[in-house]
């Protein structure tokens, strides 16, 4: 699967770009009003008690700000943060090395925490609850257990698959926060802020247009802005105007709903090759040359969310809205223009 403009996951070359755009404190963070309000209370209370913040579980779709919030938590608590991914902690010894290097009150951020191995997870339980580790040294008859006391710390876990977490791990988080898709008005504000960080002027109409096509996801909004800025600079315009924005999005093949060429290809297949469905996922995968799991996990959730696609016991089916949007009549014609 090629990197898509509307892919919610981070592209390989985007890490430093996203880092430069991140707000550092809650007052700078746009959107997720309920989460912000709750975190303000929890953080203030923890600081009044002079205790670390309770362990925090952040979950929701990719690109909504889980990593940003973890860094904000550390900044608000005025402590250091250590960042690691679940798959990178392969053995209990890896976890012990990370935890023993923390200072009192520090934040340990584990991204993709649902991918921790069961062996590592078992070692993590007492560390979260009672701040100690039991590590087995040696093998066979010479094996012995060593207890390592740990400084109090805050674990912030992030996952796009909260349902994949085991019950015991999930229950050890005192704070559960679900990140929701952003409103278009919030995305517009994010786009304007990002443009300021990039020293680029943008008219409000362009910010609204980009927000509308960003699938409720700041990562996509910032990515689209970055590409539209390329067109603006090549045109030698003094700012990003709506005409340039619309032309750029047309060339990038991102339509009014934030659907791209792959979404159009998939819906064209269902509507025109299979008369709108129902059609099985494996059949769709073969027809468009994609893996079944990629369609199920990456492509179809947004199409279902927007009401273009329906899951039925017999397979996937295009909705009346899909026919209307894709300009397909009776499953026989398409005119996929952006």
UniProtKB/Swiss-Prot annotation:
Please name the gene that encodes this protein: ruvB
User: How is this protein named in the record?
Assistant: Holliday junction branch migration complex subunit RuvB
User: Which parts of this chain are annotated as the region Small ATPAse domain (RuvB-S)?
Assistant: 183-253
Gene Ontology biological process terms from the UniProt entry = DNA recombination; DNA repair
The UniProt annotation puts the region (Head domain (RuvB-H)) at 256-338
What molecular function terms (GO) are annotated for this protein?
A: ATP binding; ATP hydrolysis activity; four-way junction DNA binding; four-way junction helicase activity
EC nos: 3.6.4.-
Task: Give, as one word, the top-level EC class.
Answer: hydrolase
What InterPro entries does the entry give? AAA+_ATPase, AAA_lid_4, DNA_helicase_Holl-junc_RuvB, P-loop_NTPase, RuvB-like_N, RuvB_C, WH-like_DNA-bd_sf, WH_DNA-bd_sf
Task: Name the reaction it catalyses.
Answer: ATP + H2O = ADP + phosphate + H(+)
Q: Which UniProt keywords apply?
A: ATP-binding, Cytoplasm, DNA damage, DNA recombination, DNA repair, DNA-binding, Hydrolase, Nucleotide-binding
Give the protein family: Belongs to the RuvB family.
Which residues hold DNA? 292, 311, 316
The domain comment in this protein's record states: Has 3 domains, the large (RuvB-L) and small ATPase (RuvB-S) domains and the C-terminal head (RuvB-H) domain. The head domain binds DNA, while the ATPase domains jointly bind ATP, ADP or are empty depending on the state of the subunit in the translocation cycle. During a single DNA translocation step the structure of each domain remains the same, but their relative positions change.
Per UniProt, subcellular location reads as:
Cytoplasm
């Amino acid at each position: 699967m090629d990197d898509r403009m509307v892919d919610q996951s981070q592209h390989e070359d985007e890490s430093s770009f996203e880092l430069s755009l991140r707000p550092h404190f809650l007052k700078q963070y746009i959107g997720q009003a309920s989460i912000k309000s709750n975190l303000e209370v929890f953080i203030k209370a923890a600081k009044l008690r002079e205790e670390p913040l309770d362990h925090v579980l952040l979950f929701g779709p990719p690109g909504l700000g889980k990593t940003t919030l973890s860094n904000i938590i550390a900044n608000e608590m005025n402590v250091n943060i250590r960042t690691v991914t679940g798959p990178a902690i392969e053995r209990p010894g890896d976890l012990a090395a990370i935890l023993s290097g923390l200072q009192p009150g520090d934040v340990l951020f584990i991204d993709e925490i649902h991918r921790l191995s069961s062996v590592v997870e078992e070692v993590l339980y007492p560390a979260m609850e009672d701040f100690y580790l039991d590590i087995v040294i040696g093998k066979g008859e010479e094996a012995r257990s060593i207890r390592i006391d740990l400084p109090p710390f805050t674990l912030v876990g992030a996952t796009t698959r909260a349902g994949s977490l085991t019950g015991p791990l999930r229950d050890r988080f005192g704070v559960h926060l679900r990140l929701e898709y952003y409103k278009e008005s919030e995305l517009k504000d994010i786009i304007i802020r990002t443009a300021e960080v990039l020293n680029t002027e943008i008219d409000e109409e362009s910010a609204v247009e980009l927000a509308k096509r960003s699938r409720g996801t700041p990562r996509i909004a910032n990515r689209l802005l970055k590409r539209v800025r390329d067109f603006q600079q090549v045109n030698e315009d003094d700012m990003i105007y709506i005409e340039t924005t619309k032309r750029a999005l047309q060339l990038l093949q991102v339509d009014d709903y934030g659907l791209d060429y792959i979404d159009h290809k998939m819906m064209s297949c269902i509507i025109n090759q299979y008369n709108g469905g129902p059609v099985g996922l494996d059949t769709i995968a073969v027809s468009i040359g994609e893996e079944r799991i990629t369609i199920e996990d990456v492509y179809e959730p947004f199409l279902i969310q927007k009401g273009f696609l329906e899951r039925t016991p017999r397979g996937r089916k295009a909705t009346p809205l899909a026919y209307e949007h894709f300009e397909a009549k009776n499953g026989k014609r398409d005119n996929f223009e952006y």
